[in-house]
Amino acid sequence: MFYRFCRSLFRFFFGVFCGWEVFGAENLPQKGPVLVIANHFSYWDPVVVGSALGRQVHFMAKSNLFSYPVLGFLISKLGAFPVDRRRIDRTSLKRALSLLDEGKVVCIFPEGTRSKTGTLLPPLPGAAFLVRKAGVSVCPVALQRKKRIFGNNLFPCYHVHVGATFSVNKPGRRDLQADADLMMAKIKELLEDSI
């Protein structure tokens, strides 16, 4: 209920003040576990992805965000869970796998951090590890910054492109980085197709 209320509120905000557009939202399966992957260039990205999709999305969020009482409470209520990016966070990975096992949608930003220039960064292998362990399909989301409101980067405007789901669980594949690169290539392909 709280998640749906917040999603409606942000959809209204992005629609009225940002002129955002969402393409291909129907590509996200309406049932079953899915790992959503997206490029990352703004603090707004999780809010935008969560607002664009028709199901509740659980995000890995950097652990220090939970140290702020109000923010930590809000993002926890919205289904986010902490990840320590300085190390392999087994607790966070187990939480993501548990959510996927329950048939939920989990989103991860394969780059592991925001790209300050907006260009795609090399992916880390975490998303590929989750897919391999959970055996779930992947839904790529490409975020495009279209313009800025109020002449600054506080409220970036987006085009959101949701691609068709795909699988990376090929028999005999053992290279996580190769799978991570494949996943990032899907995001890049969406961005290139939208130009």
Give names to the regions the model predicted.
Residues 91-195:
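Non-catalytic C-terminal accessory region of glycerolipid acyltransferases
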